[in-house]
UniProtKB/Swiss-Prot annotation:
Expressed in the radicle and cotyledon of germinating seeds 2 days post-imbibition (DPI), in stems and roots of 30-DPI young plants and in floral buds, but not in fully open flowers or leaves. Expressed in the embryo and seed coat tissues of developing seeds. The protein accumulates only in seeds and only long after transcript accumulation becomes evident. It comes from Brassica napus. The keyword Signal applies. The keyword Endoplasmic reticulum does not apply. One of its GO terms (cellular component) is protein storage vacuole. Residues 1-26 form the signal peptide. This is BURP domain-containing protein BNM2A. Residues 60-282 form the BURP domain. Keywords: Signal, Vacuole. The BURP domain located at the C-terminus has not been identified in non-plant proteins. It comes from the Eukaryota.
């Protein structure tokens, strides 16, 4: 199994994350492909095309899926490099206020209309970053790589080594990467990382790169997974996280709808897009 873990040095971290920002962005999408492909599978939580407009809604799966041989349809959407926002240094980011209370100033600063899609996305990002953590959760928003690294260390690492995991698509020839819908099968038994503290960091819509990072103080399982496409060309190697206790989650959380489970009643698992970052520490 290809290892996803390594000790972080700041120059190496910068190189890794800068690269990740300029590659593809993955969305895991649950769709019905064909009756033949579904034969013998439990597809009760898979959705037909068009049930949700946003493909990022289909990143979730059940913990019972997490085993050798399970087949899941996954859709990888190529990121438009022209739309990747700039990456600021800590010095640059610290000069710009980052709070919903400063929204009017920020919209004017970036010349963005309040009612535009970009303006609404900015508001939602700031609101999410301003929200207080729920009981048993830790969260923060990193507005630069330096601040994200420092906050990750402070939150989960203390004196322990901080490591990073990302999702990667491996192919014999880069020209053979396909972003169409494929069936992927767990090619190896998922490897659970015991005794791990974890922070998942998701890139948010904003005029510059912002990561929303969150994790739970207990009740989270972390796995390394290997997924092979049906054509045997693409190997997806990356982290998967299962939240074992969802009793404190919002009852309207989209994961419950996607998986068709009673709210707060069962574990919820998910993969990570390629531009997400997962911090782990013993």
């Amino acid at each position: 199994m290809a290892s996803l873990r390594f000790s972080v040095t700041f120059p190496a971290l910068l190189s890794l994350l800068l690269l990740s920002l300029w590659v593809v962005e993955a969305y895991t999408s649950r769709k019905l492909i064909s009756n033949n492909e579904q034969e013998g599978q439990n597809i009760s939580h898979l959705f037909k095309d068009g049930e949700f407009e946003d493909p990022t809604m289909y990143m979730f799966f059940k913990i019972s899926d997490l085993k050798l041989g399970t087949k899941l349809p996954i859709y990888f959407n190529k990121n438009d490099l022209r739309k990747v926002p700039p990456l600021l240094t800590r010095q640059e980011a610290d000069l710009i206020p980052f709070s919903e209370s400063n929204l009017d100033f920020l919209l004017n600063h970036f010349s963005i209309s309040k009612d535009s899609p970009q303006g609404k996305a900015m508001k939602e990002t700031l609101k999410r970053c301003d929200f207080k953590a729920i009981e048993g959760e830790y969260k923060f928003c990193g507005t630069s790589l330096e601040s994200m690294l420092d906050l990750a260390k402070k939150t989960i690492a203390s004196n322990a080594d901080l490591k990073v995991m990302t999702t990667k698509v491996m192919v014999p020839d880069q020209n053979r990467i396909s972003y169409a819908l494929h069936n992927y099968t767990f090619a190896e038994v998922p490897k659970e990382l015991d005794g791990i503290k974890v922070l998942g960091c998701h890139r948010m819509p904003y005029p510059y790169v912002v990561y929303y990072c969150h994790g739970h103080k207990s009740g989270t399982k972390v796995f390394e997974v290997n997924l092979m496409s049906d054509d045997g060309i693409q190997l997806v190697v990356g982290p998967a996280v299962c939240h074992m206790d969802t009793s404190m989650w919002n009852a309207d959380h989209v994961a419950f709808k996607v998986l068709k489970i009673e709210p707060r009643s069962a574990p919820v698992c998910h993969f990570f897009p390629l531009d997400n970052i997962v911090w782990v520490s013993k």
